[in-house]
Amino acid sequence: MIYRIISHIPKIFFKPAYDLYERYLIEKVKSGVLPKHVAIIMDGNRRWARKHEKPPWYGHLFGSKKLEEILEWCHELGIRILTVYAFSTENFKRSKEEVDRLMKLFEEKFRELVTDKRVHEYGVRVNVIGRKELLPKSVRDAVEEAERATRKYNNYILNVALAYGGRSEIVDAVKDIARDVISGKLRIEEIDEELLRRYLYVPNMPDPDIVIRTGGEVRISNFLLYQIAYSELFFVDVYFPEFRKIDFLRIIREFQKRERRFGR
């Protein structure tokens, strides 16, 4: 609430102090242990659009621009892996108009990634995780093109969860394991937590150190259920298009102050 009141004050009045505080936070964050993997539930696009008396697709468009900013922040700080929750399997239940608009936006953005100079300059590999078969063919083609164009890169990794559900990911992994047991490729005695990890959508990806949810809701919404068992969770009362670099830095700074016990 306080943030939303402050956000209406002309920025010119506090920009010098804001910039100074941002530089201070960057210095502090860079001097500490940085997370290797950050995951974000990008919530609040539609409510942000509603606040501005715009249709839902308008909020998703501005959300995609915010994601581009966050990729720059990660590059600046040296955070190698970013996973974002873009569209869940449950989101298909939204209105046809909104889903169609979103699919068109996804197609456009994945095609833009192929020619984005920053992607190739920074060496960003793009992975799309989820049940891709549920996506329209035009989106699947754009996804495959982006993945193919960036497959050789390994400096930074962007995982986009699309037509994704955490439970579905676990179910799909279990089915693949069962097939390998039946075919004789795998013995039941070999199955453990680490083996199951190898059957997830992105095998052997380090677990997220941090999970951020914007939009003010305090829930996980079926996101990376297997991978976030020991992640540090942060819930921010800011719509995703309004999520600021200073918010991101504060979260990382708080993460650096926490003692991670990993269930011990």
Curated annotation (Swiss-Prot):
A biological-process GO annotation: polyprenol biosynthetic process
Active-site residues from the entry: D43, N91
Biological source species: Pyrococcus horikoshii (strain ATCC 700860 / DSM 12428 / JCM 9974 / NBRC 100139 / OT-3)
Molecular-function annotations in GO: ditrans,polycis-polyprenyl diphosphate synthase [(2E,6E)-farnesyl diphosphate specific] activity; magnesium ion binding
Keyword check for Isomerase: no
This protein's UniProt keywords: Magnesium, Metal-binding, Transferase
Domain of life of the organism encoding this protein: Archaea
Lineage of the species this protein comes from: Archaea, Methanobacteriati, Methanobacteriota, Thermococci, Thermococcales
Any Pfam family matching the protein: Prenyltransf
Family: Belongs to the UPP synthase family.
UniProt xrefs under NCBIfam families: uppS
EC number: 2.5.1.89
PANTHER family: DEHYDRODOLICHYL DIPHOSPHATE SYNTHASE COMPLEX SUBUNIT DHDDS (PTHR10291:SF43), DEHYDRODOLICHYL DIPHOSPHATE SYNTHASE FAMILY MEMBER (PTHR10291)
Role noted for this protein: Catalyzes the sequential condensation of isopentenyl diphosphate (IPP) with geranylgeranyl diphosphate (GGPP) to yield (2Z,6Z,10Z,14Z,18Z,22Z,26Z,30E,34E,38E)-undecaprenyl diphosphate (tritrans,heptacis-UPP). It is probably the precursor of glycosyl carrier lipids.
Catalytic reaction equation(s): geranylgeranyl diphosphate + 7 isopentenyl diphosphate = tri-trans,hepta-cis-undecaprenyl diphosphate + 7 diphosphate
Record has Magnesium as a keyword: yes
Sequence intervals crossing the membrane: none
Protein name, entry field: Tritrans,polycis-undecaprenyl-diphosphate synthase (geranylgeranyl-diphosphate specific)
Named cofactor requirement(s): Mg(2+)
Residues given in the record as Mg(2+) binding sites: D43, E232
Name of the top EC class for this enzyme: transferase
Residues bound to substrate: 44-48, 60, 88-90, 92, 94, 213, 219-221
Gene3D superfamilies: Decaprenyl diphosphate synthase-like (3.40.1180.10)
Cofactor binding note from Swiss-Prot or TrEMBL: Binds 2 magnesium ions per subunit.
Self-association state and partner proteins as the record states: Homodimer.
